[in-house]
Amino acid sequence: MPPHPAFTEKQGQYLAFIWAYTQINARPPAERDMQRFFDVTPPSVHQMVLTLQRQGLIRRQPATARSIELLIPPEALPVLRSIQTVKTSEARY
């Protein structure tokens, strides 16, 4: 198996999300889908997409929505973790 570019834990989660979303929905995610899942701002998602593209982990067509394509095999991806913000509230009496 040829070596794959290294990626950080956070980058791996984005890559795993792109793969899982594409498998479930038969189309790549929009940046808005990633924003909702990871609960981050639009600029954060956009910068991550640009970074993944610069590192040769994804390819996309400029000015074409939902055009993200993974350039690494699924076996090289980490398991996608569920991102949940746990909020607790206290009842005040």
PLM feature spans:
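Short, cationic-aromatic polyanion-contact patches
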Residues: 5-11, 30, 61-83
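Pre-recognition alpha-helix immediately N-terminal to the DNA-recognition helix
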Residues: 13-20
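Short helix-capping/hinge SLiMs at alpha-helix to coil transitions
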Residues: 20-26
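A short alpha-helical element within helix-turn-helix/winged-helix DNA-binding domains
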Residues: 28-38
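Glycine-centered, phosphate/nucleic-acid-interacting loop/turn motifs that mediate DNA/RNA or nucleotide
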Residues: 56
